[in-house]
Amino acid sequence: MAFFDLPLEELKKYRPERYEEKDFDEFWEETLAESEKFPLDPVFERMESHLKTVEAYDVTFSGYRGQRIKGWLLVPKLEEEKLPCVVQYIGYNGGRGFPHDWLFWPSMGYICFVMDTRGQGSGWLKGDTPDYPEGPVDPQYPGFMTRGILDPRTYYYRRVFTDAVRAVEAAASFPQVDQERIVIAGGSQGGGIALAVSALSKKAKALLCDVPFLCHFRRAVQLVDTHPYAEITNFLKTHRDKEEIVFRTLSYFDGVNFAARAKIPALFSVGLMDNICPPSTVFAAYNYYAGPKEIRIYPYNNHEGGGSFQAVEQVKFLKKLFEKG
């Protein structure tokens, strides 16, 4: 894929008009308050992972409305009494997989909490958490992007984002986690989830947001025909009369609107040839991000973004942040 979006100098200034409903904050306050009525009840069950330098725990905690969510907690076998923690969110249709799939952060001296994404985990890494839709489910295009999309209260990502906030709380409850060094991280869908949590969680202290999905929906579906955004396009291709209803729902889940409310230090990344999460949708979120921020730009990369290069940048970013703090 060659360059297809705005020139870089325009991307750096790109701040489209934000569309959000007046009750955006109220919607999320009520959503989180509903789930806080249920005990978090985190369970950390030590397991035999055959890893020599990492202790692995099979995690279960209460997410949206008390529904039980799976995860992993990976603790490096170090002498420190308290360790920083990275809460990791997963890309589209991936699940938590196995503990040995998530060894990068433990090898860097961080506890890693991996949240399984409800209903997903049959596309690349396996998942173990079912989704529990909100009442009757309207017709949808195959996938997750249009599940419950005719009402923000029934939309799939309402449940996912709530799970993700509760995941930070579950991670924070583990005795060895340093409360002042909790990081939320993810790429693609995981980046979009982490971006939402950066505005919704009071416990997260830093954000690592790579090639984020779930940002500036209307431009994304009008600019690219790749999946997963194409799920929305194909839904509207059939349901020709639902455009405004769909984009109204999506406004409650748009990373651009969460970015405008986020305050914690953040490191973003973008691939300028990314035809899955187009550069302008990433820059829309980045340019509205209200906290201290940096972005790493990879001109000749598609959705893989910076790969291992970005991982090095993240380690340096957190080292500088926490040493300064």
From Swiss-Prot:
Sites where the protein binds paraoxon: 188
Binding site for substrate: 92
Location (main, coarse): cytoplasm
Thermal response of activity: Optimum temperature is 90 degrees Celsius. Activity drops sharply above 90 degrees Celsius. Stable up to 100-104 degrees Celsius.
Effect in UniProt of substituting residue 276 to A: Greater than 10-fold reduction in catalytic efficiency toward the acetate substrates. Reduction in catalytic efficiency towards fluoroscein diacetoxymethyl ether
Active site location: 188 (nucleophile), 274 (charge relay system), 303 (charge relay system)
Entry's Gene Ontology BP terms: cellulose catabolic process; cephalosporin C metabolic process; polysaccharide metabolic process; xylan metabolic process
A Pfam family hit: AXE1
MF-aspect GO terms: acetylxylan esterase activity; calcium ion binding; carboxylic ester hydrolase activity; cephalosporin-C deacetylase activity
GO cellular component: cytoplasm
Protein EC: 3.1.1.41, 3.1.1.72
Mutagenesis / variant outcome for changing residue 88 to A: Minimal change in catalytic efficiency toward acetate substrates
pH dependence: Optimum pH is 6.5. Half-maximal activity between pH 5.0-7.5.
Superkingdom of source: Bacteria
InterPro entries: AB_hydrolase_fold, AXE1_dom, CE7
Regulation: Activity stimulated by up to 40% in the presence of divalent cations such as BaCl(2), CaCl(2), MgCl(2) and MnCl(2) at 3 mM concentration, but inhibited by 82-85% in the presence of CdCl(2) and ZnCl(2) at 3 mM concentration.
Keywords: Calcium, Carbohydrate metabolism, Cellulose degradation, Cytoplasm, Hydrolase, Metal-binding, Polysaccharide degradation, Serine esterase
Quaternary structure (record): Homohexamer, formed by a trimer of dimers. Also exists as a homodimer.
Family the UniProt entry places it in: Belongs to the carbohydrate esterase 7 family.
Protein name, UniProt field: Cephalosporin-C deacetylase
Organism: Thermotoga maritima (strain ATCC 43589 / DSM 3109 / JCM 10099 / NBRC 100826 / MSB8)
